[in-house]
Amino acid sequence: MFKFRDLTIVDITPELRMVISCDSSGGIGNKEGDVVKVDPEIIGYFTTHVAMMELIAVGATPISIINTLGVEMDSTGQRIINGINRAIEPLNMKENIMITGSTEENIPVCQTSMGITIVGLIDKTKWRIKKASKEDLIVVLGIPKVGNELAQDM
């Protein structure tokens, strides 16, 4: 077992690795205590997107998404799950990815929070971790945005 950036990698067999990625979000949503006000579906989408891109970047195939939602299922949790489903639509793998998770039904909450963990598998022969070398040209497009900056573009 080892870590690479935000990933945890576990050798399952001599040919197969399990890759685990995760991300979280807090204080962003439509609840009274949220600092950034957006539809919870947006949180589900972007939090899933971040963890999914980290997993796919090394060549892993996602098999399971585990959401830990610090909100009630009806209706905030369901909106977040809608965003999770929207994030995986472009992969055309929805039937191959098991989505499971948990919500907070015991305590009323006044702030939106969620965590996401994605588990994937990769054949060791297809493992790809590349590092930039002196001869590489690295191009970055766009402007980094966070919180309200991103919400304004929605």
List each model region and its residues.
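Helix-biased detector of long, well-ordered alpha-helical tracts
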Residues: 1-154
